[in-house]
């Protein structure tokens, strides 16, 4: 299947040059890393990042922090596993797919062998295009990846995993299988958990709730993340993908974590009465 874009022209620019300009703006923005991607990267080990998926004007500079780190730690042929929440509710509860996804910067191929192996070896994961047709959480990550490719930093294939079922057992099961297949296929891998943090709460409340989850992420404690999301009614959309990413990274030997940036939509709109939180973190 060749999947066309769904939110180009809405979440990010539709035209090639406008999108390049927007991505560079995200990197150079005061809320961003303030530097363009590194062209001197070298892949040494798997890395995992958390990247938000709102409109680029709101969350793009925060996402740029994660992709700046990726640019420093990749080279050659890379498989990017992108795990995102399923906002539409369409399709299977956890699914991957095969084929090609379009972006305004050019197409990105799915690592079909990886996707098929996940489907065949994991009872949790279906091979289902339907779940991906209208979903934006994975799509909005792809222009950042393609931009790195256009800079000759690395050559990417990717594996989309959409999750509408985000209970603890499902999330850790997905993470374990991602790590298992990466080892079996000897892939140079990065894992991107696509998630925003708290939604539509006053800044003070949202930032306090998000700080609790960020602390759990930095400790790489999957069970604490799940418990604190439920206990504190944290309205983050991708806690399951985050738990899956952390589980996979721990299986792959990760020992370190770092908060790269945190911000809210209020920093853009200047309306702090109802914000969405955005965080960029790295696990390696």
Swiss-Prot record:
It holds the Pfam family Memo. CDD domains: MEMO_like. It comes from the Archaea. HAMAP family: MEMO1. Belongs to the MEMO1 family. This is MEMO1 family protein Mevan_0697. It comes from Methanococcus vannielii (strain ATCC 35089 / DSM 1224 / JCM 13029 / OCM 148 / SB).
């Amino acid at each position: 299947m060749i999947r066309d874009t769904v939110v180009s022209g809405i979440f990010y620019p539709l035209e090639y040059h406008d999108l390049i300009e927007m991505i560079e703006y995200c990197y150079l923005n005061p809320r961003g890393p303030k530097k363009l991607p590194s062209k001197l990267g070298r892949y040494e080990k798997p890395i995992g990042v958390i990247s938000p998926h709102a409109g680029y004007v709101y969350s793009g500079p925060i996402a740029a922090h994660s992709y700046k780190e990726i640019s420093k730690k990749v080279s050659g042929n890379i498989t990017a596993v992108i795990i995102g929440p399923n906002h539409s509710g369409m399709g299977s509860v956890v699914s991957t797919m095969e084929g090609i996804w379009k972006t305004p910067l050019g197409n990105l191929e799915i690592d079909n062998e990886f996707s098929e192996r996940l489907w065949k070896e994991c009872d949790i994961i279906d091979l289902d295009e339907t779940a991906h047709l209208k979903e934006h959480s994975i799509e909005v990550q792809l222009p950042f990846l393609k931009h790195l490719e256009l800079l000759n930093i690395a050559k990417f294939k990717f594996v989309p995993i959409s999750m509408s079922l985000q209970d603890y057992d499902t999330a850790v099961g997905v993470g374990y299988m991602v790590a298992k297949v990466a080892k079996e296929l000897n892939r140079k891998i990065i894992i991107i958990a696509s998630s925003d943090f708290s939604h539509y709460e006053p800044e003070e409340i949202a930032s306090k709730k998000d700080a609790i989850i960020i602390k759990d992420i930095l400790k790489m404690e999957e069970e604490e993340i799940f418990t604190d999301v439920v206990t504190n009614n944290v309205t983050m959309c991708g806690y399951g993908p985050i738990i899956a990413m952390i589980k996979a990274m721990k299986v792959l030997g990760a020992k370190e974590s770092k908060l790269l940036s945190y911000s809210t939509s209020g920093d853009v709109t200047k309306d702090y009465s109802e914000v969405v939180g955005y965080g960029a973190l790295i696990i390696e």
